[in-house]
Design a protein with these regions (language model features):
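Macrodomain-like recognition of ADP-ribose-binding/processing modules
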Residues: 1-180, 186-205
Length: 208
């Protein structure tokens, strides 16, 4: 079962929690800071991995300790100062989906990967996470950013065809219509005339 909700990730009863991290060993903000305070041994393990340059975008890893704590540290950005990229989140989700069975994950709770300090939009991240994980045979709780409209927590919203740009951030590129290309070429030729006046709004409207 897959469900999106608003609430406290740490109150989830899921077997495995997902933490968003960078690749330089800093957990200074957001949900990562809370993970650091709650699970200091996990942070030391994470810091050791980053010191060895063993953590890469697109390759989350499972941390498990003797007490039964299971945390997936999921890199959403290279440096903590950098924005998150949707393409990196997608690669990480593919990796997580491929390893979930091997990691013996029976239930999963995760934050809105790359949103907040990462700068990504829930309207892109939520549907992407649903697309990549909803078919897994486990219970999944996806915690949306506070203030997310209820309609954007529904399966109808999450399963709708997205307009994601996996080159990074923002919406899908819209191809230029042929008439726009012709118009741009006319404007370019006008501007190239040696004694041409600048093309103002009136002339532009007449050409259009």
């Amino acid at each position: 079962m897959f469900r999106a909700l608003i609430g406290d990730l740490f109150e989830s009863q899921a077997q495995t929690l997902v933490n968003t991290v960078n690749c330089v060993g800093v957990m200074g903000k957001g949900v990562a800071e809370q993970f650091k305070r709650r699970f200091p041994e996990m942070f030391e393990d994470y810091k050791s991995r980053t010191d060895r340059k063993a953590l890469r975008l697109g390759e989350p890893y499972l941390y498990r300790d003797s007490s039964g704590v299971q945390i997936v540290n999921f890199p959403t950005k290279d440096h903590w100062r950098s924005p998150s990229r949707l393409a990196d989140v997608e690669r990480g989700l593919d990796y997580l989906a491929a390893h979930a069975a091997g990691w013996e994950i029976t239930s999963l709770a995760l934050p809105p990967l790359g949103c907040g300090n990462g700068g990504l939009e829930w309207s892109e991240v939520g549907p992407l996470i649903y697309q990549k994980l909803h078919d897994l045979p486990i219970d999944i709780e996806l915690f949306a950013p506070y203030g997310t409209p209820k309609q954007q927590l529904t399966e109808e919203f999450l399963s709708a065809p997205s307009q994601m740009s996996l080159e990074g951030r923002g919406r899908k590129h819209v191809p230029l219509r042929p008439e726009w290309v012709v118009l741009m070429e006319v404007l370019r030729e006008l501007e190239a005339q040696p004694y041409a006046s600048p093309v103002g709004r009136t002339i532009f409207q007449k050409i259009s």
